[in-house]
């Protein structure tokens, strides 16, 4: 009988979480949802020097923002130390591990000799018990590490869902340290116990872990566990072709929120960064879950493309509810010095979003492009001299007069504009440009009738009148 699917995301809370990291949560989440399985969150916090509470918060916040909900956890490895020690004791009883007294200095010297002889540097099994072998006398006052008895012959073979068949000779693997002198278990051991206890059936993770896999499989088999399906994801490259990292300028997951990206756009982009469904570029969360499979995971490194993300975000902004965008835009307005009271006194923010969103790649950009609605106009003197000429002033005055009594609809504003253009034999830009400048303070706006409608009759008429006085 097939086991129910159980996947996991097991980040180390040692700082920064970027798109490359969070992708290792997205794919196991999607696979668990697709297979009606269980998605487990496990925090691998055994690196006490580098693990921080702030990093844990960043992981949880990033997952929540993208909607990557977990069914179990978060489990913390530091809270499972008693369990690891229990398994270590069982392994000692079964002779699966042995104490090794080789010092760091002795190990370094051994590796230097091996390198000088052109050999692969590795532990040579000095303290490994074998029938008929006489072990050295344990040095006084030295607490040993515990090493796992790796098989000496044969191979570790697994069918990787991304890489295909992988075979590693056991002769390539030395006896791994699985407990330090103070009894603290090491990373590769903790991972195996966790995956075994948590019944993980599919391990979907970055291929920087692939070298750990044969060691973990051997420990898992020694403990009588069933080997999960492994899928090792190729790395994510930045736009310069380097591995994505903070050092190479990667932005944190929440940095995208703070830059005005929508979570559905980032999730859609991230899904395509190493997986595909035919030619589909745009798809909902529900479609992604329905379509996701391990067979279509990419086998080559995926390269981040900021322009592609902007294109996707623009699509989702255009699809988004204007009231939602208005709420998302408020912090960006605040950063520009436009507070809630100012917004309340100005044009309807929801209407502004509806008008301005089509041209924007981010919510931040919508806010930046919409400040004209909430600030007094300060048109450039050169632009005024160019557009507000004596020749056009009579037409401006007539247009202002017409707007005092016109019905305040987009259609009526457009009709008034058209009538004045006809009466004064002007082309649209000759009147629209000075109106934009005097009302909005800029010549760069969407259609003039829509902009004036949002500003409102009183503001439009008073600004035109003041400029013509």
UniProtKB/Swiss-Prot annotation:
Any GO MF annotation of the entry:
glutamate-tRNA ligase activity
Main location as per UniProt: cytoplasm
Concerning InterPro entries, the annotation shows: aa-tRNA-synth_I_cd-bd, aa-tRNA-synth_I_codon-bd_sub2, aa-tRNA-synth_I_CS, aa_tRNA-synth_I_cd-bd_sf, Glu-tRNA-ligase_bac/mito, Glu-tRNA-synth_I_codon-bd_sub1, Glu/Gln-tRNA-synth, Glu/Gln-tRNA-synth_Ib_cat-dom
Q: What is its EC number?
A: 6.1.1.17
Q: Where is the composition biased (Basic and acidic residues)?
A: 118-131
- Highest taxon of the lineage: Bacteria
Where is motif 'HIGH' region found? 11-21
Per UniProt, which keywords does this protein have? Aminoacyl-tRNA synthetase, ATP-binding, Cytoplasm, Ligase, Nucleotide-binding, Protein biosynthesis
Catalytic activity annotated for this protein?
Answer: tRNA(Glu) + L-glutamate + ATP = L-glutamyl-tRNA(Glu) + AMP + diphosphate
Q: Where is this region: Disordered?
A: 118-139
Q: Which Gene3D superfamilies match?
A: 1.10.10.350, Glutamate-tRNA synthetase, class I, anticodon-binding domain 1 (1.10.8.70), HUPs (3.40.50.620)
Where does the protein end up? Cytoplasm
What processes in GO biological process is this protein linked to?
Answer: glutamyl-tRNA aminoacylation
Residue positions binding ATP: 246
Please tell me which stretches of this chain the record labels as motif 'KMSKS' region: 243-247
Q: How does it assemble?
A: Monomer.
Q: Which GO terms describe its cellular component?
A: cytosol
- Family under the similarity heading: Belongs to the class-I aminoacyl-tRNA synthetase family. Glutamate--tRNA ligase type 1 subfamily.
Question: What gene is this protein translated from?
Answer: gltX
Instruction: Give the protein name, as stated in the record.
Output: Glutamate--tRNA ligase
Q: What does this protein do?
A: Catalyzes the attachment of glutamate to tRNA(Glu) in a two-step reaction: glutamate is first activated by ATP to form Glu-AMP and then transferred to the acceptor end of tRNA(Glu).
